[in-house]
Amino acid sequence: MRSARFRLPTSRLARLVYASVILTSVSLVSIFHARPRVWAVDAVPVAFWAWRTQSPNEVDVQAAVEKAKAQVLFLRASQIDYQDGKLRRIRPFTGSLPKGIKLHLVYNTTRPVLEQLESIDPQTLAAEITRAYGEDSERAKRDGADVKGLQLDIDFPTRLLPRYAQTINALRPQLQPHTEVSITGLPTWMDSPSLNSVLQSVDFWVPQFYGGEIPTHFSQTVPISSPESITYFVNKARQLDKPFYAGLAAYSVALLYNASGSLISLRGDMNPALITSDANLELIDQRSFSSAERRYAFRARANGVTDGLNMRAGDVLVIDLPSSETLRVAARLVRRMAGKKLLGICVFRLPVSDDPATLTVEQVTDALNDHDSSPAIYVRVKRQQQSNNTHVFALEFKNGGAASPIMGSLKVDLIVPAGSFEGITAGQDVSFQPLCAASGPRPCSERRADLLRLTIDFLAPGQTLTTTLLLNRDLPATTGVSVAMQTETEQSYSAHNEIPIEAGVK
């Protein structure tokens, strides 16, 4: 049997039509596979997500606006709880709503609601959320705040996403016209066909590009976010073709495992400094991930409490610390791959002065501006009230930069008169070694030492530590200080300065 041969059309019109079809097909294929336009650094709007009962103060919000150029704030308004078969609003925010920034009020649910989502009527849930939003909108008017919309932060199981769509559709008609409705999105939803129906019900969404996998056993080493997971999630979000803010993490996560390695609890609000300085916790492991995120593991020596967390002897507390570089890498990937439906980057969480678990606003700003995280360790020496013949000095160490030292790598050398050392009140997070500077610093007795080396376990950006130095004679007007450390990006940093001895308490 003779094989069939393909022949081009013979007429001129047919050839033109055929060529047009081929060109159109090639164009469509090219468009489908074309790489998205890369966003310029300064072209991506910035938003923050605030999740505390207390409304953020004006100073912290203004810092985010002025330094990070924040335009939008997603602010926790309250939770919806389920008790005795009824839904009710609990834990409403306290304080005045911030002005000078566009607000979206966020509502989530308690665990009892999540456990009953399959049986709770979507209309009833929508009505309770609408009632809470109405009350909060009136408060916003009195506070002079600019509320643009409502956001739902409800962790519906993937199989129940159709009920989430029903809830949002029931919510819409109860809101004022032009109210923007959005949701946060879990990484586990990305591959569900049901997600499309949810997204059709909202104006935009904020998918979380982190926390896609929780390490349920101590042996698992899973970062909060990784370049690989962010690449996957950003590509999925772009393909869904719905306007979105890219949700990026800027806070540490602490995970408590029992002695057998099973996960007990997870917290995102623990103070890393309290963990590293706890004498009951023994550092047993530290490692870095590819994007300068670091993981530290501590074993509890005995039963105890650290930053409100109860631990038993043998439990292991793991803390994953992001860095400015972690966020920088994530933001760079978003700008490169998000495409035209990107509305901006939403940083989880808003930096505030009393939240040591979150990156500082300076760290976030450097990251979003694609700047290197610069180290800056400042040392101050202040004279204190003299006790008998003992001269007392307060030593203050402050991390004023955007880079953290790797735990245990920060060393500060302070020159003192030979033989003057009497004592130092170093805490668990500060240790010291007496040195003799001649012929290169080398260990020597305290009575001969003319150089004190202080090793600081942990000093995060924005953190300040103070310790007390006792000498048997006064310091001169100035003294030499040397600082050396390894940053979380494993870069070496060193500096030497002549600093003045400041007047203190007489």
Each predicted region: which residue ranges?
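Conserved, mostly hydrophobic/aromatic
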Residues: 73, 152, 205, 246, ...
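Substrate-binding surface in catalytic domains of secreted glycosidases
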Residues: 166-277
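Asparagine-centered strand-capping/turn motif at beta-strand->loop junctions
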Residues: 389-406, 414
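Catalytic domains of carbohydrate-active enzymes, especially glycoside hydrolases
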Residues: 56-83, 136-147, 337-341
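Low-complexity, intrinsically disordered segments enriched in Ser/Thr together with acidic residues
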Residues: 448-491
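Substrate-binding cleft of secreted/luminal carbohydrate-active enzymes
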Residues: 247-253, 259-372
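Chitinase-like catalytic core of GlcNAc-active glycosidases
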Residues: 39-53, 78-201, 207
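A surface/secretory-pathway sequence property marking extracellular, secreted
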Residues: 418-453
